[in-house]
Design a protein with these regions (language model features):
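Glycine/proline-rich, positively charged
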Residues: 1-53, 57
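Short acidic/polar active-site loop segments enriched in Thr and Asp
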Residues: 13, 38-41, 68, 128, ...
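Conserved, mostly hydrophobic/aromatic
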Residues: 15, 43, 62, 69-72, ...
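Active-site-adjacent beta-strand anchor residues
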Residues: 18-19, 73, 127, 146-149
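Glycine-rich beta-alpha junction loops
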Residues: 21, 47-51, 73-80, 136, ...
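Aromatic-lined glycan-binding groove of carbohydrate-active enzymes
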Residues: 54-94, 128
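Terminal-tail/helix-coil boundary detector
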Residues: 64, 88, 92-120, 124, ...
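Short catalytic/ligand-gating loop segments at beta-alpha or beta-beta junctions
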Residues: 126-134
Length: 201
């Protein structure tokens, strides 16, 4: 009710949530409709080629109920940009190196192997791996927009041209071969108690 009041009073425009499972988003929609409250406009889940689990339930739910999906982690913390070579050696300045914990837990042997193949695919089509990672996420069905967390203007300049790019069918299929739809090789939901999983190496 508090969020409904904030919207109706003009203090905020929209309501969103982050890293919620499909059932929790659906529960929120049902409560809003039964009580005539303003309902969720967006959900902000982790989503990248290495962790595609939201495609199983959350994406179809969002499409049906017109919920925007503003996803985070499109570059998989740099794994899809080819920054990692081994699971136990983190690039200087990376979140895995600086903070460890659940950030480091997202780095998997399988994820790194996929990242290296992904880098080759990007080179083959003539763009950077970071650009391809963002492009793949941007052009997936049901995704409203991916969030980017660049720390430098240089990185931003690399990614901005992706706005004008379109993912072709052949590249999409090649990505599906690397990590099939709905599956995962790295756990980016590892801060969510309802969706933690272990990646078997």
């Amino acid at each position: 009710r508090a969020l409904d009041d904030l919207v109706t009073q003009g203090k905020i425009r929209y309501i969103g949530c982050s890293t919620h499972p499909a059932w929790a988003v659906m529960e929120s929609i049902m409560v809003s409709e039964s009580k005539n409250y303003v309902r969720l406009s967006t959900e902000q889940p982790p989503y990248n080629l290495l962790d595609r689990r939201i495609e199983n339930e959350l994406v179809p739910l969002a499409q049906r109920y017109k919920i925007g999906l503003i996803t985070w982690g499109p570059l998989a913390m740099g794994v899809l940009a080819g920054r990692y070579k081994t699971p136990n050696e983190y690039p200087k300045g990376s979140r895995a190196a600086r903070r460890g914990g659940f950030y480091a837990d997202r780095i998997s042997k399988k994820g790194i192997a996929i990242g290296q193949e992904f880098t080759k695919l990007a080179k083959k089509i003539g763009i950077s791996a970071a650009q391809l990672a963002l492009l793949w996420c941007k052009d997936q069905p049901g995704i409203t927009a991916p969030l980017i967390g660049t720390r430098t203007i240089k990185h931003l300049d690399i990614l901005l041209p992706v706005l004008e790019m379109t993912l072709d069918d052949d590249t999409r299929k090649a990505c599906d071969v690397l990590v099939p739809p709905g599956s995962f090789v790295a756990d980016f939901h590892n801060t969510s108690y309802w969706n933690r999983a272990r990646v078997l190496e």
